[in-house]
């Protein structure tokens, strides 16, 4: 699904970043967002 980064989240490289939920490594209770357009742009957001 679509995902938008939280500015205050960890690992924010490009925020707010719109992309997809990636099963990467974020802290428990967070989702990892990965950009559609940039493979190196990623961040974590609090699970809704």
UniProtKB/Swiss-Prot annotation:
More details: A synonymy between H.magnifica and R.crispa is controversial.
Looking up InterPro entries in the UniProt record yields: Anenome_toxin (IPR000693), Myo_ane_neurotoxin_sf (IPR023355)
Report any one BP term from Gene Ontology. Answer: regulation of signal transduction
Q: Where in the cell is it found?
A: Secreted; Nematocyst
Q: Which UniProt keywords apply?
A: Disulfide bond, Ion channel impairing toxin, Nematocyst, Neurotoxin, Secreted, Toxin, Voltage-gated sodium channel impairing toxin
Give an example GO molecular function: sodium channel regulator activity
Name which cysteines form disulfide bonds: 3-43, 5-33, 26-44
Read off the Pfam families from this record.
Toxin_4
Q: Which SUPFAM superfamilies match?
A: Defensin-like (SSF57392)
| GO CC list | extracellular region; nematocyst
Lineage of origin = Eukaryota, Metazoa, Cnidaria, Anthozoa, Hexacorallia
UniProt protein name: Delta-stichotoxin-Hcr1c
The role this protein plays is: Binds to site 3 of voltage-gated sodium channels and inhibits the inactivation process.
Q: Which organism is it from?
A: Radianthus crispa (Leathery sea anemone)
Q: Which domain of life is it from?
A: Eukaryota
């Amino acid at each position: 699904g679509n995902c938008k980064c939280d500015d205050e989240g960890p690992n924010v490289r490009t925020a707010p970043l719109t992309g997809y939920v990636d099963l990467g490594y974020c802290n428990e209770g967070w989702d990892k967002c990965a950009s559609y357009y940039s493979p190196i742009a990623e961040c974590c957001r609090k699970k809704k």
